[in-house]
Amino acid sequence: MKINYVCFFLLLTISNAIAQEFQGIATYKSHRKVDLKISSENENSEMKKQIQEQLRKQFQQEYTLTFNRNESIYKREEKLQAPQPAQSGFRIQIAQGSDIMYKNMKENRYTNKTEIFGKLFLIKDTLNNRQWQLVNETKNIGDYTCFKAVFNDEITTQTLTEEGEIETITKPRTTTLWYTPQIPINNGPAEYYGLPGLILEVNDGDLTLVCTKIIINPEERVSIEEPTKGKEVSQVEFEEIQDKKSKEMMEQYQSRKGNDDGNRVMIRIGG
């Protein structure tokens, strides 16, 4: 009987060790839809093309998801870019944040380190999975067979009209994911998770994330550390701060209306 207990203990220990050792690194590339409108007495189609191209390059980013069965870290890969020469008197430089998204599936929580308007925040909250609708469709992404899942909701945004007025827009949104049961973890890039396999592709109509490389059980053990720097807030508190700051910026823009000599470039990210 004692021998049986010892064997059972060893088997349990080995099983736990195997489960904990499963880990990997997935690389994703992003593309974002940009709706560009130019409000000017002398609309310049060539300038519009140049802005569109600069924005396209700015939004092409690379991210890594480092994961094990219980935790993950998702962050943008830093890369050195040669300075872009100003064209037609302008150059676009979009500030790319150093966001780090930590998810703990076992404890059902996440921590998101993010920066807005020069201030660092640490968003801590409970994971809130969407009610995904599993669809009987498949496709291959690299060497993996992926299955489709969709989620429908509404998104509300504030924007400035061509007249400089603040407009609130609510529109339907469909998010489509592709996940593979061949990598049996319920995780994915950014805030996405909750499907029976690693999520390899995301498309919400504006943003597309596609996995381009996966390393399972790399030789060097992966490091997953929860971020700790920043002002700690909940997700709701952060969104309230973000909305307030965005509204303040739009109001400042409104106050300068009429002093832009009739030339204004309006860039809307998304549809």
Regions found by a protein language model. Give the residues of each.
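Bacterial Sec-dependent N-terminal signal peptides
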Residues: 1-28, 271
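Extended soluble regions of mature proteins
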Residues: 21-271
